[in-house]
Amino acid sequence: MNQTLHIENVVLGGGEAGKYLAWDLAQEGRPVVVIERALIGGSCPNIACLPSKNVIRSAKVADLVSRAASYGVRTEGATVDMTGVRQRKREMVDGMMAIHRRKFAVPHLEFLLAEGLLVGPRTVEARLAEGGSRRFVADRLFLNLGTRATIPGIPGLADARPLTHVEALELDRLPSHLIVIGGGYVGVEFAQAFRRFGTQVTVLEFGTQLPQPPESGPWASAPVAHNSRT
């Protein structure tokens, strides 16, 4: 391990909030180290927001093709190739990673792919993915630790080896039947996408209606439920 280095700012976690904070600090000429364990740029461009929208776009095209005859276009024999859907998604993620690497490679900013551990007051040890470690004492330490998918404690569910959104985005074949537990926006967008690909889908929602964002009002559940069936 090298000697402990003093630095003005350390951001633990390079996800959505942390990366923009780090970029702004660096632009102001204020030294900052970003320590990220695995996903450059966080969940959104790697395993969540953007990849899911990429897959949803493919599903929208599949749905349009399935209704092409109503537009006077014949598309007999068209099929969904999930390997191709996944490859398109992966290429988008690779492109986003290239963009993030460039944005992190700026003056006053150092990006470390490492596991960060708090080992003392405002002191972080970065265990580097490539081996070795470094230690920093920061004037300001920002925690941007993010979230992770969890499996609810439903009896027997863990034994069924369920998928989270992370694994669902990596499927290379269509399941004959997909059960989605939870009718929130993530569950519904996956449900509709796979239905449009041709999978039979069942959504299990614990409430009496599909949840809706507070700003949308109670009127949103009915049209969302209707559109999810198409």
Question: Where does each model-flagged region fall?
Answer:
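Glycine-rich flavin
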Residues: 2-7, 24-30, 35-174, 207-211, ...
